[in-house]
Amino acid sequence: MTKIKRQINNFDFRRIKILLKKWNVVIYFVLILICFYFIIPIYFPNNDKMNLWLSSIKYYLTYPIYNESLTKTDAYIINTYYYPKSSSLGENAIGMILLMNRNTQRDMTKYRMKLIASNSSHQSVIVTPKFLEESYSSCPYINMVAMVNTLPNLNKLEIFDGERKMEIPFQMGKTTAPASVIICISPQFVAEQWQLFVAHAHVARKFGGHLHMYVTSIIDTFFDLVQEYERLGYVTIDYWMRLKLANSSVDSVEPNLHSELRNQAGAQSDCLYQYKEAAAFITFFDLDDIFIPRGYDSYFDEFSALYELHPNILTFQYTKRETMVYNKAKIEDINFEELFGHTWFVNEEDYGKVMTKPGNLNSMWIHESWNIPTNRHHVSKSNYIIHMQKPVDPDGTDPVSYRMSNFEMLESMQLNASTLIPIQDDLERVLKSSNISMTAEDLPNKTYYFPIIYRCYYEKFYKKPKKDSCPNGEGCLIPQRTGTNCIHSDADFKSGPEMWPITYHYHVNSKWSRTKGCHA
């Protein structure tokens, strides 16, 4: 015991004090990191405001170390929307949809873009938007959304890198919608399955929905049919471009080949921002995703009931159930009781799609948003999406015979005839009172491009999913066919001045282009 006391007395505590003084900054920094990264999140796991504040603190603590710009890249500004008043974004808000190169810096959500906003009162302000990322794969280009508040009566918006400026075209977000429920349809390319469109359009109309359909390329006769439905108020057709860099550099990465699934997530985010202040509810479906309310007379009623039952949920997801489908050669032969009144389904659920209030969401991926906390996202078990994935041709040919589905008779999933008869009546009314019947005479009665594209997708990534890959339909061989022509989205493509670290590209004057042959 005496020996231990002697050792303690001989120990030089002054040296420890000096060392602590020298390292006190480092020690404090480590303690702060432990506090913000580990301790506070334990006590506030579900507090969104606290989590947002913590994220901001973490960013400012680590920005000097990790977030330097790494390399010169390109970005494409798809659309920019301005909201004088927004319930979710605030006043004088900007929402910008971009395709950006993830290699610009380590965390693209922390990218420091500078925007100069000017208005009609000769006021100007420099603002830095917040970024949200929506991507899953390892593609170089990722879907990004930039949000920031600017000035009243905005009339000019520019990107500024410290030396050069580039003006950004913008448009007003919609203030009214054709229906209270908007159904965003993912971009169609080499589209020919007109039967799916007719089914979706009439189902949506019956239950209070409106289709907003993006088109990259589509069979010309199918496009004529969709335009007739647009005149009748069933659908809004929108452009979705194959992106072109007007002035690319030697190091520029081609955007179409190196973006996830043709940047479908970008279209979902774009649709969200168009209707952010106009629709009560918004969904993000493919053309072959048909949703029919169960126990309710309309989409609005079912969605409202879900939110009343789960008041803390921001987004709902409905899973998919594949159903057996036989296409008809003529539009007059389509029968909704035959389409949806049977019981043949695959007895398993596929990754679903999202429904939400537009104000609850600021960005969107393909199947869900990665920016919604898991405890604020709910997978509904009260209903499902009818997935008309692989329709059989009118002559009985199965276009996807190499990937047969295991159908079973599931009596519990049968829809009542009373639900389907009014939809059939609506189709027959339209055929009698419009130009639809005449326009439909030239529609293809058998699929040609669908099995080609499906096979390409299957061989490229569905057959053998690869980790860290970039799933994309680019490179699919699309053989041309005599007498089959397409309508393509087109525009005047522009490039801004070379900037550091990002050069920006965009398009103006969107238009439909009729061409011989079809390409994706």
UniProtKB/Swiss-Prot annotation:
Report membrane topology: Single-pass membrane protein
EC numbers listed for it are 2.4.1.-
Major place of localization? membrane
Q: Where in the cell is it found?
A: Membrane
Stretches that traverse the bilayer = 25-45
* Assigned keywords, A-Z: Glycosyltransferase, Membrane, Transferase, Transmembrane, Transmembrane helix
Source superkingdom:
Eukaryota
Residue ranges annotated for the GT92 domain, each copy included: 181-463
Entries under InterPro entries matching the protein? Glyco_transf_92 (IPR008166), GTase_92 (IPR052012)
Keyword Transferase applies: yes
| Pfam entry (one) | Glyco_transf_92
Q: What cellular-component terms does GO give this entry?
A: membrane
Question: What Gene Ontology molecular-function terms does this entry list?
Answer: glycosyltransferase activity
Which family, according to the similarity comment? Belongs to the glycosyltransferase 92 family.
Name of the protein described by the UniProt record: Glycosyltransferase family 92 protein C35A5.5
Q: Which organism is it from?
A: Caenorhabditis elegans
